């Protein structure tokens, strides 16, 4: 299910510049900061949500203020509500049949890939980690029926490209205790 809102994602190589960009982004448009944090490698990530036009204006201001400290920026239109709900927190699934994990080289592509995965197949997004405490990398996990999980993982990888991926795993018939680990 899509949430009919957009997400703006900015990754900066400077924590101070990131905080300045966040302030400018929030002042420039009617957006809600979903994530704003320092991550490993001295980077700062910002994720804002709102109507597409507001997010576009906010992201433009963030890129302007961030200048050469901007490492990456993306917009996700009509973000899937499951990807947004699992952003930097674990969302328990009722039943776990299969588990899919995609680990990304950088933080923000994990969110972009998780959104694509959730839109491609009927899966539950269990978590989207955007770099906090994991060396600046990112990952997402999805659970569901094995075929759906395979489809979701493939769609997530396709959305960001193989070069952005560290690893992708599908565990069919996951053990019941795996639920506590994801």
Give, region by region, the residue ranges found by the protein language model.
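An amphipathic, aromatic/His-enriched active-site/gating alpha helix that lines ligand/cofactor pockets
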Residues: 58, 62, 156-159
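Hydrophobic, ordered structural segments
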Residues: 48, 52-55, 63-80
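N-terminal structural module
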Residues: 10-31
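A compositionally biased, intrinsically disordered/low-complexity signal enriched
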Residues: 19, 46-48, 55, 111, ...
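Polybasic, low-complexity intrinsically disordered tails and interdomain linkers
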Residues: 24, 36-38, 63
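Short, structured secondary-structure boundary patches
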Residues: 53-59, 146-151
């Amino acid at each position: 299910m899509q949430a009919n809102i957009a997400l703006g994602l900015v990754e900066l190589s400077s924590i101070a510049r990131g905080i300045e960009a966040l302030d400018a982004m929030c002042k420039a448009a009617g957006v809600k900061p979903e994530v704003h944090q320092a991550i490993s490698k001295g980077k700062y990530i910002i994720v804002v949500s709102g109507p597409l036009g507001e997010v576009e204006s906010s992201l433009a201001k963030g890129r302007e203020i961030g200048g050469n400290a901007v490492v990456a920026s993306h917009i996700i239109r009509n973000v899937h509500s499951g990807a947004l709900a699992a952003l930097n927190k674990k969302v328990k699934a009722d039943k776990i049949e299969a588990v899919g994990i995609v680990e990304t080289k950088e933080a923000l592509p994990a969110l972009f890939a998780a959104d694509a995965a959730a839109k491609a197949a009927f899966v539950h997004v269990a978590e989207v980690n955007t770099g906090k405490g994991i060396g600046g990398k990112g990952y997402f996990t999805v659970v569901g029926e094995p075929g759906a999980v395979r489809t979701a993982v493939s769609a997530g990888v396709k959305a960001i490209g193989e070069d952005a991926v560290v690893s992708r795993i599908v565990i069919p018939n996951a053990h019941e205790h795996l639920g506590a680990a994801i």
